[in-house]
Design a protein with these regions (language model features):
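Proteins with a high burden of low-complexity, intrinsically disordered sequence enriched in S/T/G/P/A and R
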Residues: 2-11, 59, 97-98, 109
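Conserved binding-pocket/active-site segment within a compact domain
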Residues: 31-89
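Extended, non-transmembrane interaction/recognition domains
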Residues: 1-39
């Protein structure tokens, strides 16, 4: 996968694109972030998104990301150090690759008849919150 984070100074936004490496370059996710987000709000939103992801995992009986989410929470509680905040966001990033959120949790949700919108809502909230924290740190 390829991540591109680009700041366009004229309109004060970050443009984040996530692409899969293949013959066809197809953007899987595209987000525009404010170049001056409130980092404390971003951290709060990420903590909430992690809690929702943990709740979904508990609902489906999957605990493969439990340590990742616990480590993310631990690091996000030390907001005096931006490196801890960044590492917390990266610990919460359970996307891409075999055995990732996109593979495991998506498949189990489908098997357990969890509504697609519920999985999508939790996934988008977590992914967006991670990106917002990263953009917030880059703008700090």
């Amino acid at each position: 996968s390829i991540w591109t984070i680009k700041r366009v100074w004229q309109d004060t936004h970050w443009y984040v694109t996530y692409r899969e490496i293949s013959g066809v370059k197809k953007a899987l996710f595209y987000k525009v972030c404010s170049s001056s987000p409130d980092i404390k709000q971003c951290i709060y939103d990420l903590k909430n998104a992690i809690q929702k992801a943990q709740k979904l995992c508990d609902t489906i009986g999957y605990h493969g990301f439990e340590e990742d989410f616990q480590e993310a929470h631990r690091l996000l509680n030390d907001t005096d150090r931006l490196d801890n905040v960044l590492n917390g966001a990266l610990s919460a990033c359970v996307f891409a690759g075999m055995g990732s959120w996109n593979d495991e949790v998506a498949a189990i949700c489908e098997d357990k008849n969890i509504p697609q919108h519920q999985y999508t809502e939790v996934t988008n909230a977590l992914f967006s919150a991670i990106l917002n924290v990263v953009c917030g740190i880059c703008s700090y």
